[in-house]
């Protein structure tokens, strides 16, 4: 087994927690996988795995090697895909899952361009805020904005966007414009409830950092709902520029406290665990990544 294949085998062993799980993914014998890892450890003269009755876990050196090996394997796959893409016509059906706000604001407006590039390809787009099982539902690629809740997913970051404190001019005319993060505690804040994100936010300005616990009368578990509440003048929100791109461009909402930085929000392409992403899925991820890097303002799908 060559070095890159051995690195891929090691990655799959760590992800699966066993030689048998990795062997099943690679469609090869368990003994062959075990031998490949042993040869890899011998080659680099470092123990990568701890073997016990509870399974296999990476050593400290193994964890470092895992991260670097994963990047190397992904880069090699991207190089192969790029070479194939130059001569291969994509065809068949691509199944995409996207969350509602991200799908509506960031994916749908760009879909015509992707379909124009690949006339032999059909697309099924599932727009849903639930965390669905990609394998069980036959999804080729999922698109998420924000922190990923499942660390075992095969994921690729495709974009990053600044968060802002955003409200309508009408709301600010009534409630006043906050001059500091602490002033937000006196405002109605539309709270977007997420599993990994509470209502406390850290604002940075140079070396200064201020944490503020935000509160308000309205809480939602939907980004689309947060948009609707802000546009209805019910309050302000901490939100990505993506979420309000059309309104920011039209100046029907405005950002405040712009000299303070909030943690950015990241967009991810995720692929079914345990198998290599298809050429169609990788092509779509690359397309969205390129499109979102062109400019901060994105077109919207009007109702």
What is the predicted function of each stretch?
Residues 67, 120, 241-254, 260-303:
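C-terminal effector-binding regulatory domain of bacterial HTH transcription factors
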Residues 40-41, 253:
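Conserved amphipathic alpha-helical core elements
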Residues 12-27:
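Short helix-boundary/capping micro-motifs
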Residues 41-58:
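A short LG(V/I)-centered, amphipathic sequence patch enriched
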Residues 29-32, 36-39, 110:
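Residues within the DNA-recognition helix of helix-turn-helix
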Residues 53-56, 63, 74-97:
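Short helix-loop hinge/linker segments at domain boundaries
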Residues 91-154, 301-303:
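Central regulatory/effector-binding core of bacterial HTH transcription factors
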Residues 152-163, 167-190, 206:
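Flexible hinge/capping segments at coil-to-helix
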């Amino acid at each position: 087994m060559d070095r890159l294949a051995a690195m891929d085998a090691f990655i799959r062993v760590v992800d699966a927690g066993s030689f048998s799980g990795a062997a099943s993914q690679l469609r090869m014998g368990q003994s062959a996988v075990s031998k490949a890892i042993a040869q890899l450890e011998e080659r680099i003269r470092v123990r990568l795995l701890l073997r016990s009755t509870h399974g296999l876990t990476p050593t400290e050196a193994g964890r470092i090697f895992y991260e670097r090996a994963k990047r190397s394997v992904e880069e090699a796959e991207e190089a192969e895909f790029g070479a194939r893409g130059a001569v291969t016509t994509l065809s068949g059906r691509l199944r995409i899952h996207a969350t509602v706000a991200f799908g509506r604001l960031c994916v749908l407006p760009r879909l015509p361009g992707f379909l124009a590039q690949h006339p032999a390809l059909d697309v099924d787009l599932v727009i849903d805020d639930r965390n669905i099982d990609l394998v069980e539902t036959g999804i080729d690629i999922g698109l998420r904005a924000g922190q990923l809740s499942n660390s075992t997913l095969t994921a690729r970051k495709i974009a990053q966007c600044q968060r802002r404190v955003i409200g309508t001019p009408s709301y600010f005319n009534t409630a006043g414009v906050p001059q500091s993060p602490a002033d937000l505690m006196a405002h109605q804040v539309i709270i977007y409830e997420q599993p990994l994100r509470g209502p406390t936010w850290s604002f940075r300005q140079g070396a200064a950092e201020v944490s503020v616990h935000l509160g308000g009368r309205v809480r939602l578990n939907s980004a689309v709902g947060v948009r609707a509440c802000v546009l209805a003048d019910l309050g302000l929100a901490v939100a990505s520029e993506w979420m309000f791109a059309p309104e920011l461009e039209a100046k029907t909402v405005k950002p405040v406290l712009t000299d303070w930085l909030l943690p950015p929000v990241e967009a991810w392409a995720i692929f079914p665990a345990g198998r290599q992403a298809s050429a169609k899925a990788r092509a779509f991820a690359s397309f969205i990544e390129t499109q979102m890097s062109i400019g901060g303002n994105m077109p919207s799908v009007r109702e």
